[in-house]
């Protein structure tokens, strides 16, 4: 009897179709680890009851895939073994077999971000894992983008990232152990700024690659960031993350329309923070970010650019009337004549 070959789908976008050629869920359920040491993420992702973690799509993992996921998730959280963590990140970026684990990795990242807001190393690891997942050329991520954005946006706009002044991780720096906080209450630990900046860069990358296939993606991100920036009850760290994201995602047009018209009102927030020793450093970071935003806006003018304002000191009142006295003083101090001209020529009533 001659041998023949028949083609069938093992998986479609990471989901195993229910056809006779593929094993059924009931046949594969016995492969899942059981007992108190079983991985809850795998159990939830495969449809077992009594677990709160819900996958994006339920399908069966082979025993090898289960073991791979367990090793990856363990390595990502092991901040004491950098070599192992780097190996996991390399696997996520380059291994074609990761596609089968995409749903579980995204769920894992989202859950860890949600429950580890006070743990900077975990947040950093989750952002790195997201970055490597985006860089894997063998994975079709378009359907997953709406689920990947929220944890990254949380790292960008989160109210408090890192330990509080009354709490420090076992491997915390001496600065944190001496009572420094990460979000502007007490002396400042700046690690959370790097987390927010990395998250903003990831959102920029996501928008560049996937905004065409995910309608309204850029608009939703920008709306969330603008709302956070205009909420003056939010901490300065949130304002910083919002500014970084708006600058990277919307570019010069977003700065001109969303940020520039609100700087005069924001001047009061800056004045109050600069007068507070515990928040002064954070306020200076935000001022520096605002200047970068204005530089980007000015550079985008292209051929419209001129020599700038000749007498900056003489234009201080006009500048302050548009962007507030703190930003105006920084523009004059840094001799940003072209930026001053771009601001003075901007029609804020049309923004």
Regions found by a protein language model. Give the residues of each.
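Extended HEAT/HEAT-like alpha-solenoid repeat tracts in very large eukaryotic scaffold/adaptor proteins
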Residues: 85, 122-132, 148, 173-206, ...
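Intrinsically disordered, low-complexity terminal regions
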Residues: 1-96, 104, 152, 170-183, ...
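Generic recognition of cysteine residues
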Residues: 5, 140, 155-156, 207, ...
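Alpha-solenoid helical-repeat scaffold
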Residues: 54, 61, 65-75, 81-87, ...
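Acidic, Ser/Thr- and Gly/Pro-rich intrinsically disordered linkers and low-complexity segments
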Residues: 113-123, 131, 156-195, 233, ...
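Alpha-helical solenoid scaffolds in large eukaryotic transport, assembly, and signaling factors
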Residues: 45-166, 211-213, 246-258, 264-271, ...
